[in-house]
Amino acid sequence: MTCAPIRSVVVVGGGTAGWMSAAAIARVLGARCSIRLVESDEIGTIGVGEATIPQIRQFNQSLGFDEDDFVRKTQATFKLGIQFVDWGRLGDAYMHSFGFLGRERGLLPFHQYWLKAMLAGSGGDLGDYALNVVAALQGKFMRPAALGPDSPLSSIAYAYQLDAGLYARFLRAFAEKLGVRRTEGKVRDTVLRAEDGFIEAIVLESGERIAGELFIDCSGFRGLLIEQALHAGYEDWSHWLPCDRAVAVPCASSGPLTPYTRSTARGAGWQWRIPLQHRIGNGYVYSSHHISDDEAAATLLGHLDGEPLAEPRVLKFVTGRRRKIWDRNCVAVGLSSGFMEPLESTSIHLIQSTITRLLSFFPDTGFDPVLIERFNQKAEFECLSLIHI
């Protein structure tokens, strides 16, 4: 049976997740579908996921963004990798860089030749064979140059360190030009269809009723639609990842910007450092069973590059994921779908991958259950692969 195409999409929640969703759907579907985003300025966004991985460039390019304009308006810096400090033992540091390592020779991967050289006493540090590592540690960056396939400068892999709030604003301006309609308000109730439990509409505190065919839940940890209305369920992964809180604070820059994010091991977790053009983003992810909020804040404040620009803010979370990212006619994107501590800078990437998957599996009004099940299987596999990196 042929079902009618989706003609109306309602996005609940703004921030990075909401506006990435609205912008991408509007870009792909255009005038074929009306898109309405509901958010409230009274509800703050988390906005600590400021580090990205190279796939974000594909997302921006697919929307047609000019990179210079994007960097300028989001106060972004370029990122060649992540430096891990004190993880093996105090004083240790290594750079997990993007891009290639060495050059393939014959049938064997490069690291096999390096291992042979190490056994012979002449291999040297593995990072010396990675362009991104060498450049990052010297504070250097350049965009890929058209120098031919044999030049390592022709395929430089990089990402961004950005202000998530400014990125959401940038996306909003783009989405609204494409016809996305923003409504200010808080959701008071969710109306479900009696016959199948699908979401029929949301009701705002003002009394306005907003109907839709497909709903995107970007409401954050509370999962306003996916959990509070549809009860999709949540898998708690605290037994694998015991960190359950983060304290975040921005500080002033005190030196040259570094083209990498830093992750430093601490007694009860780890600390991030993300350099932006106008400030440095800092946070301490920790287990509340091993350290108090005040102790965590004191530790963070004692390891800043410059003067703090705000009071430390504590965020509470339960590591895990929704049992169903897509349930009936609702898809959870961002924190409403789950949370994993951003050790590998994957928070914004998971938003991107969920949106990309949704567009690949975009339904009609029949909402084929086989399609939804396959979507959820892929989402589960992705999350499990990330925690086992």
Where are these regions (language model features)?
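N-terminal Rossmann-like FAD-binding beta1-loop-alpha1 element of flavoenzymes
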Residues: R7-C33
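Glycine-rich FAD pyrophosphate-binding loop
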Residues: A26-V48
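Dinucleotide-binding Rossmann-like beta1-alpha1 core, especially the glycine-rich loop
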Residues: G44-A136
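Low-complexity, highly charged intrinsically disordered N-terminal segments
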Residues: A93-F170, F174-L178, T183, C218, ...
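Predominantly flavin-linked oxidoreductase catalytic cores and closely associated redox partners
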Residues: P149-A296, I355
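Conserved FAD/dinucleotide-binding core of flavoprotein oxidoreductases
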Residues: R266-V318, S336-Q352, F361-D368
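Conserved small/polar residues in nucleotide/adenosyl-binding loops
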Residues: I387-I389
